[in-house]
């Protein structure tokens, strides 16, 4: 699955939730995703982190190979709100059933860096 296909598949599911992918690229084994959130307030909305993460997990069934994920979150006014990450190892462990939904979510939430 190339970057254009991956971006399209992410956008299809996320736009209805107020998450707008603004940039997506793969570089040296890392998926970089930038998106804007329509959610009010400051910081990184945890619910939207979950939505992006769940969509990536669903794409594993469609042939996407897990990569380290680095995400940057901005407001629709383009103000940086923060960043988060998910390691490829965590995604693969979840896919194998070795890491629960709760444990994966907690690991990712723990990586959030507010702007």
Language model feature labels by segment:
Residues 1-115:
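Acidic, polar-rich N-terminal leader regions of halophilic archaeal proteins
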């Amino acid at each position: 699955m190339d970057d254009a296909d991956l971006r399209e598949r992410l956008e299809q599911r996320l736009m209805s939730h107020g998450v707008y992918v603004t940039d997506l690229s793969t570089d040296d084994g890392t998926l970089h995703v930038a998106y804007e959130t329509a959610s009010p307030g400051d910081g990184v909305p945890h619910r939207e982190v979950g939505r992006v993460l769940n969509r990536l997990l669903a794409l594993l069934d469609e042939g996407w190979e897990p990569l380290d994920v680095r995400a940057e979150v901005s407001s629709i006014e383009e103000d940086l709100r923060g960043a988060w990450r998910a390691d490829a190892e965590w995604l693969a462990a979840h896919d194998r059933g070795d890491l629960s939904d709760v444990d994966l979510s907690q690991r990712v939430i723990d990586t959030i860096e507010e702007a």
